[in-house]
């Protein structure tokens, strides 16, 4: 079972339970959700009306905790630890996993130095063990550890819950991408038309060149015929006259009498 399917089943169960809980029972359920080893999305629980009603009550810290796991990082928790519930080891692990997902949203190459600061890890061995055992084996990221360059290359990372305002930014980005794609398509179509026109012109020029060659061939053929006839006239008829004249002026041989 992949991570998305597993999460869907867990979320469905928790949403059903949370939707019928009273406010005093929501705190333990939120702690359970944020500690679950296979749950990395919390927006559906956060969207429940009775969960939203925790705002302004004595249990509002659990609502803040749920928001932290939906959108925040380990660094955010450290900055607000005094007004949030104390985290269990499972929750700390979960929040650090979510921190890696947040970092991978904007960068596909994560330097070890950045990760060690963001995760409060003191050495490379500990960091690499965490990335392998708690992130890659958990299925939330796919990547490669580059010990020479001291970085974590992340071609895939599971998505987190959308932060407030993030959907609008995504729509704006998609709109810009769509406009760019349309302009690119128009440019490609123009280039295709230009190529077609050039092809037609090339065919036309080639045809004209072939016709020109044929005309030259015909002209040369006609000139050759004329030259041959001229040569026959120059060297054929005068030769006959000369023979005639030679025959006309040739002296006749006298026959001498024979003496006996």
UniProtKB/Swiss-Prot annotation:
Changing residue 12 to A: No effect on the interaction with CSN8. Residues 228-260 are annotated as: Disordered. It comes from the Eukaryota. One of its GO terms (biological process) is red, far-red light phototransduction. One of its GO terms (cellular component) is COP9 signalosome. It is found in: Cytoplasm; Nucleus. Phosphorylated. InterPro entries: COPS7/eIF3m, PCI_dom. Residues 1-159 form the PCI domain. Changing residue 44 to A: Decreased interaction with CSN8. Strongly decreased interaction with CSN8. Residues 251-260 have a biased composition (Basic residues). The keyword Cytoplasm applies. Changing residue 153 to A: No effect on the interactions with CSN1 and CSN8. Keywords: Cytoplasm, Developmental protein, Nucleus, Phosphoprotein, Phytochrome signaling pathway, Signalosome. The PCI domain is not sufficient to efficiently mediate CSN complex assembly and for biological activity. Belongs to the CSN7/EIF3M family. CSN7 subfamily. Component of the CSN complex, probably composed of CSN1, CSN2, CSN3, CSN4, CSN5 (CSN5A or CSN5B), CSN6 (CSN6A or CSN6B), CSN7 and CSN8. In the CSN complex, it probably interacts directly with CSN4. Interacts (via PCI domain) with CSN1 (via PCI domain) and CSN8 (via PCI domain), and (via C-terminal tail) with CSN6A, TSO2 and RNR2A. Cannot interact simultaneously with CSN1 and CSN8 to form ternary complexes. Also exists as a monomeric form. Binds to the translation initiation factors TIF3E1 and TIF3H1. Component of the COP9 signalosome complex (CSN), a complex involved in various cellular and developmental processes such as photomorphogenesis and auxin and jasmonate responses. The CSN complex is an essential regulator of the ubiquitin (Ubl) conjugation pathway by mediating the deneddylation of the cullin subunits of SCF-type E3 ligase complexes, leading to decrease the Ubl ligase activity of SCF. It is involved in repression of photomorphogenesis in darkness by regulating the activity of COP1-containing Ubl ligase complexes. This is COP9 signalosome complex subunit 7. It comes from Arabidopsis thaliana.
